[in-house]
């Protein structure tokens, strides 16, 4: 019994010792776990900080790149704007502004922007050109331009011819030149310049002749020979198409015929030729101040206006009422 009791006491002491030894070991493990956790936390934190720094650096780099791209784009746009030259040209609506519109794209390819300013009268385009509000205009022929310069003491010059609007003979009660009969009545424009052109057409046909050399100042009073005893009725140019039923023939301006729905190509019995004195004299021109005559952009405009592309455009669109000339 005593021996048994001694064994039990010894066993208890051993168990106590074992328990004491186990506790520090568990504590060490716990401490090690804590240390590992702390180390892992620090590593995660450090990695997060590094990631944040890299993200911030990338963001700053991206922002710098975007700023640089924006500045580059702005510089390129500025450079393009500086390279592109703008010219303003005044014009009457038909056919002048329409012809200029066909020049916009060809000029754009050369770095020239063409702005078209439309006018509805024949005074303002020259005034705007003289004052510098526009660089050039397109609506008039040289005699009109010269008269304006004389009256206004201005220095506008022609940069070149573009087109003419041929005057032609049209049938009224008589539908063919061969139908001409004695005493036929022919309608003529009542303004001096257009009437002279009309009389030159009749001379070309052999219907009348003049005492001296005929020119663009010829009048009815200059007629010397009238073998068919023709009668002449003077009317405002725009009234002639409406009066065809009351006339045997009428001599009508190309633009007036166009406005009246008359086909110059199909309906005219005879028209002025491009090399005639009238066509060359009354061809419509581009005009500008003398100091702008050598403007490269205006020279480029003239080159485009004289190109085959624009000549084809004019011939197709206006059915003979407007004819390209250079």
Where are these regions (language model features)?
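Sec-dependent N-terminal signal peptides of Gram-positive bacterial secreted proteins and lipoproteins
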Residues: 1-26
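Short, polar/charged alpha-helical segment
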Residues: 86, 93-118
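A bilobed periplasmic-binding-protein/Venus flytrap-type ligand-binding module shared by bacterial periplasmic
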Residues: 166-177, 282-295
